[in-house]
């Protein structure tokens, strides 16, 4: 999950509201104190935290809840709105021809983000190419070239040319027919005079439509100083925050974004190209507060899965065979780690009724899903289509063929029956818990 520790702490604070007998000044102060602690531990700037805390207190005690909203929901809504105020709305990413310049510190994940960004635009139907203008770091050329080849992205570089400005000029000319051209510049300390001069020269030659600064989520309080230096040099138009997975604090990077007023454009939440997301502030805050992000989950499914992966029409008609379940397990595997998928579900769905699953439990569940596939690999086409045929003798045969126990085969059949019943229950209904929650809170 994105910033898991901060999310857990914020959700814990809001649970005090839900469990409180009445919402008075004492309750609000307790909740605000917990929110303060959570944000400060995540490296959010002290000034930002104190200002937000004061506004939450004042609004919670002075503002009357809108019609149809109880005091608890009103305070949660205020917290949501104030977090949105700190983070901002996010950058507007237009799908049109453009030049993008990438800047950032060495080790921030800038080169990897460059390739992933090109891949993002390609998935949206635009031709994207990358220029390797980082001549400072040994291995930068080969790293970017390898990434681009892996992602099937056009690449331009001059391995033995030390002149980054000349490479940029030549690269943009070579990629002239491409819609999106992304220039990867050298990553060093933002206050180094030679880096600033080189960035300014590349900026003058490339005339980029966007200048994205890449920040490591774990950079801490020094993020603000670095962000200001880059912004003063070339004028940052957007921020990409990398390594924003479960272990990252991330508050320093978020503070830098707030102070420079440069909107967040993308976030990196893992190693694969699929773990690179366009930033949507409302969805990000929803995930932090345990409201889930069903819209992102659906978009991820649409981007990753083909019509062959899941027979939606058959599912909605209540037809769910073992073949369908096998495809479903393969589809989930394509979408990424189970923990990441579950983090997009509202608390109570992904969190098993509000109880968060441990890493060990997620791993055990993933292992069980792999086990189920192994068992189904030992079934006949007839059995996969009609599970009712599987009796005692067939269970023994499947058990021997898969190397699993008869009990595990029976467990699989029971799981299939449970899924089949659940899908029949959803048929014809509109199930959108996140939409209901947000509508209830007026968000």
Swiss-Prot record:
Described by its record, this protein's role is as follows: Involved in targeting and insertion of nascent membrane proteins into the cytoplasmic membrane. Binds to the hydrophobic signal sequence of the ribosome-nascent chain (RNC) as it emerges from the ribosomes. The SRP-RNC complex is then targeted to the cytoplasmic membrane where it interacts with the SRP receptor FtsY.
Q: What is this protein called?
A: Signal recognition particle 54 kDa protein
- At which positions is GTP bound? 104-111, 184-188, 242-245
Documented EC number(s)? 3.6.5.4
Q: How does it assemble?
A: Part of the signal recognition particle protein translocation system, which is composed of SRP and FtsY. Archaeal SRP consists of a 7S RNA molecule of 300 nucleotides and two protein subunits: SRP54 and SRP19.
Recite the UniProt keywords alphabetically: Cytoplasm, GTP-binding, Hydrolase, Nucleotide-binding, Ribonucleoprotein, RNA-binding, Signal recognition particle
Question: What species does this protein belong to?
Answer: Methanosarcina barkeri (strain Fusaro / DSM 804)
Domain notes for this protein? Composed of three domains: the N-terminal N domain, which is responsible for interactions with the ribosome, the central G domain, which binds GTP, and the C-terminal M domain, which binds the RNA and the signal sequence of the RNC.
Annotated Gene Ontology cellular component terms: signal recognition particle
- Source organism superkingdom: Archaea
One GO molecular-function entry? ATP hydrolysis activity
- Gene designation per UniProt: srp54
UniProt record, GO biological process: SRP-dependent cotranslational protein targeting to membrane
């Amino acid at each position: 999950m994105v910033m898991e520790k901060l999310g857990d702490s914020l959700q814990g604070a809001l649970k005090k509201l839900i469990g409180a007998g009445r919402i008075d000044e004492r309750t609000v102060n307790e909740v605000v104190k917990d929110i303060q602690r959570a944000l400060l531990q995540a490296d959010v700037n002290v000034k930002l935290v104190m200002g937000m805390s004061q506004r939450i207190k004042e609004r919670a005690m002075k503002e009357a809840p809108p019609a149809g909203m109880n005091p608890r929901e009103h305070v949660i809504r205020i917290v949501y709105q104030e977090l949105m105020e700190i983070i901002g709305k996010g950058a507007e990413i237009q799908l049109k021809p453009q030049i993008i310049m990438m800047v950032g510190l060495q080790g921030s994940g800038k080169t990897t983000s460059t390739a992933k960004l090109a891949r993002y635009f390609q998935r949206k139907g635009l031709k994207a190419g990358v220029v390797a203008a980082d001549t400072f770091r040994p291995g930068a050329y080969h790293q970017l070239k390898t990434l681009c080849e892996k992602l099937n992205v056009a690449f331009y570089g001059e391995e033995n040319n030390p002149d980054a400005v000349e490479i940029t000029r030549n690269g943009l000319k070579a990629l002239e027919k491409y819609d999106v051209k992304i220039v990867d510049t050298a990553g060093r300390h933002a206050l180094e005079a030679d880096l600033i001069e080189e960035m300014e020269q590349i900026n003058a030659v490339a005339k980029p439509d966007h200048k994205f600064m890449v920040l490591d989520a774990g950079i801490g309080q020094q993020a603000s100083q670095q962000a200001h230096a880059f912004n003063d040099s070339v004028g940052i138009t957007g921020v990409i925050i990398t390594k924003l997975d479960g272990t990252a604090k991330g508050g320093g990077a978020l503070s830098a974004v707030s102070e420079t007023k440069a909107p967040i454009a993308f976030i990196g939440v893992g190693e694969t190209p699929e773990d690179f997301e366009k930033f949507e502030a409302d969805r990000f805050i929803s995930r932090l507060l345990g409201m889930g992000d069903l819209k992102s989950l659906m978009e991820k499914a649409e981007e990753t899965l083909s019509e062959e992966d899941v027979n939606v029409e058959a599912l909605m008609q209540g037809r769910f065979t073992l073949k369908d379940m096998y495809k479903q397990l393969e589809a989930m595997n394509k979408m990424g780690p189970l923990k990441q998928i579950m983090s997009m579900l509202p608390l109570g769905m992904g969190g098993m009724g509000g109880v968060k699953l441990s890493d060990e439990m997620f791993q055990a569940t993933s292992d069980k899903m792999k086990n189920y596939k192994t068992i189904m690999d030992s079934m006949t086409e007839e059995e996969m289509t009609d599970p009712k045929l599987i009796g005692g003798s067939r269970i023994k045969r499947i058990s021997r063929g898969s190397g699993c126990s008869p009990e595990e085969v029976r467990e699989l059949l029971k799981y299939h029956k449970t899924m089949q019943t659940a899908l029949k229950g959803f048929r014809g209904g509109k199930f959108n818990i996140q939409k209901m929650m947000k509508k209830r809170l007026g968000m």
